[in-house]
Curated annotation (Swiss-Prot):
Protein name: Large ribosomal subunit protein bL36
Domain of life assignment: Bacteria
Source organism phylogeny: Bacteria, Thermotogati, Deinococcota, Deinococci, Deinococcales
HAMAP family for this protein: Ribosomal_bL36
Organism of origin: Deinococcus geothermalis (strain DSM 11300 / CIP 105573 / AG-3a)
Family: Belongs to the bacterial ribosomal protein bL36 family.
Gene that produces this protein: rpmJ
Amino acid sequence: MKVRSSVKRMCDNCKVIRRHGRVLVICTNVKHKQRQG
């Protein structure tokens, strides 16, 4: 899980979603997991 000020999709499988007021990126590739913080 990377914590970034700006989350971006890194590949076609990445999805940008909002959970509990946080912006997250979930992906089949574990290295692409990000959250905004």
